[in-house]
UniProtKB/Swiss-Prot annotation:
Belongs to the allatostatin family. Its main location: secreted. It comes from Carcinus maenas (Common shore crab). This is Carcinustatin-7. One of its GO terms (biological process) is neuropeptide signaling pathway. It is found in: Secreted. The lineage of its organism: Eukaryota, Metazoa, Ecdysozoa, Arthropoda, Crustacea.
Length: 8
């Protein structure tokens, strides 16, 4: 998963 998946 990319950082964007965690909303960062």
């Amino acid at each position: 998963a990319s950082p964007y998946a965690f909303g960062l």
